[in-house]
Curated annotation (Swiss-Prot):
This is Ribosomal RNA large subunit methyltransferase H. One of its GO terms (molecular function) is rRNA (pseudouridine-N3-)-methyltransferase activity. Homodimer. Gene3D superfamilies: 3.40.1280.10. It comes from Cellvibrio japonicus (strain Ueda107). Keywords: Cytoplasm, Methyltransferase, rRNA processing, S-adenosyl-L-methionine, Transferase.
């Protein structure tokens, strides 16, 4: 099974890169995780945020692989406990499907990207900075894997 994280934003701070890399290297070999970074659309004081989000959404839709199940990370999505995420992960593994997780930019996900998602998942009711979401997401995926493997990390 393959998980692709499709995220708006490149040139993350070093602490984000290090945090993400730490958990990505811990992932089990049978669960390949790939980060796909998309450029942030130009924004200025007078720019049209909706246009920027639309451009990011188009790039995101183009990056989604054929046959991938699409999960959008959105504050209005359904919250899962870590145990529920582990159950979902086990279900996805059993189905043999590949899937992608969408992380929006500073203004969130474009409506077109949200519409493409079969699942909308909320990591938290809090508004989180998109760089931090990368670390939270990969850590929760790793934690879910440890639950499935009865590894003591989750205890």
């Amino acid at each position: 099974m393959r998980i692709r994280i499709i995220a708006v934003g490149t040139k993350m701070p070093e602490w984000v890169e290090q945090g993400y890399a730490e958990y990505a290297k811990r992932m089990p070999r049978d669960l390949a995780v790939e980060m796909v970074e998309l450029p942030l659309a130009q924004r200025s004081k007078n720019s049209d945020v909706a246009k920027a989000m639309e451009k990011e959404g188009e790039a995101m839709l183009a990056a989604i692989g054929k046959g991938e199940q699409v999960i959008a990370l959105d504050v209005k999505g359904k919250p899962w406990s870590t145990e529920q995420l582990a159950e979902q992960l086990a279900s996805w593994k059993m189905s043999g499907s590949n899937f992608c997780l969408l992380i929006g930019g500073p203004d969130g996900l474009a409506p077109a990207a949200l519409a493409q998602a079969t699942i909308k998942w909320s990591l938290s009711p809090l508004t989180l900075p998109h760089p931090l979401v990368r670390i939270l997401l990969i850590e929760q995926l790793y934690r879910a894997c440890t639950i499935l493997q009865n590894h003591p990390y989750h205890k």
